[in-house]
Design a protein with these regions (language model features):
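Bacterial Sec-dependent N-terminal signal peptides
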Residues: 1-31
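Outer membrane beta-barrel
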Residues: 46, 50-69, 77, 81-212, ...
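A generic membrane alpha-helix/interface feature
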Residues: 9, 71, 78, 164, ...
């Protein structure tokens, strides 16, 4: 059987950043579950919105035109083409986000509430809905609970406003479809820049595992996801950063068949099936290991 890949030419027009109730100098949110740094720029907030300085409403849209080789071509991101169409205009993303920060007596917040929707011609879905609580004594710990991006890898958490391309890599889309999941996460990230470990961030969280593919968790198996990230170090005109990630989870077996890698009689690598009835209802392991590094040239 010969499989042919149908190529799709995508031409994103532009990304429009719509900012409301923001300071004159834009400090946007680079990572999906982080706090917007503009909350701390008190002296640049316009007096007319002084009353709402702890509230941010932001958004952006990414209109797109796509041309495929034939009608009804499958598309990995954005949905398949309709039966009688090989070209289309579409809204790849149209986001509106509301962030509210509960201030503390210090310059750092007590809590962050974040809510984001994606409203396109395909419907309206919730992308983020989480509460982040900060430890205010030493300002190094936080807890995040709700629907938010899973802390695995660099690209999964990187906002599309900062990526070089509109879409994440195919690997990220396959392993982490939708990027988000429901769970709880604990983070170590010193807020004070003078702290000796201010360049380190550690996340560890527990998640349902199915992401946005279902309305509820379909089994009792949860995903453990953790990530150690080294924030950028500057060397002249270069910034170097990196991290390591680990996911340990599983799926409940709906059948008695379990496939594992093995060896054939001639030494070839094959999948070997185990059809024992004891496999029914057990957990099939899902373990991911990741490492990433970023090098940025300032110019």
């Amino acid at each position: 059987m010969i499989c042919r890949k149908k190529q799709i030419i995508a031409a994103p027009f532009f990304a429009l950043l719509l900012l409301f109730l923001t300071p004159n100098k834009v400090h946007s949110q680079r990572y999906l579950a982080d706090i917007d740094s503009s909350f701390f720029i008190k002296d640049t907030v316009r007096p007319v919105i002084k009353r709402f300085e702890n509230l941010r409403i932001t958004g952006y849209i990414q209109p797109q035109f796509q041309k495929a080789q034939s009608d009804g071509s499958p598309s990995f991101s954005g949905g398949n083409f309709s039966q009688f169409s090989s070209s289309r205009f579409m809204l790849r993303r149209a986001r509106v986000k509301i962030d509210y920060v509960l201030p503390s007596k210090s310059r750092y917040p007590k809590a962050l509430f974040s809510f984001q929707i994606d409203a396109t011609e395909r419907g309206v879905i919730v992308r983020d809905m989480f509460l982040k609580l900060f430890e205010t004594k030493n300002n190094v710990l936080s807890m995040t609970a709700g629907l938010f991006a899973r802390p695995f890898g660099y690209e999964v958490n990187l906002s599309s406003a900062f990526r070089e391309t509109p879409e994440r890599g195919r690997m990220s889309q396959i392993l982490m479809p939708g990027e988000r999941d429901i769970g709880i996460m604990f983070s170590y990230e010193p807020q004070e820049k003078k702290h000796k470990l201010s360049h380190i961030k550690v996340d560890i969280g527990f998640f349902n595992g199915q992401g946005l593919s279902g309305t509820t968790d379909f089994d009792d198996h949860k995903d453990l996801i953790t990530r150690l990230f080294i924030k950028p170090y500057s060397f002249n005109k270069l910034d170097l950063s990196g991290g390591v990630s680990y996911l340990r989870g599983g799926w409940k077996n709906g059948t008695k068949y379990v496939y594992e890698s093995g060896k054939a009689s001639n030494g070839d690598n094959i999948f070997v099936v185990d059809s024992s009835m004891a496999n029914l209802g057990k957990s099939s392991p899902r373990h991911y290991y990741g490492a990433d590094a970023q090098l940025k040239l300032k110019h």
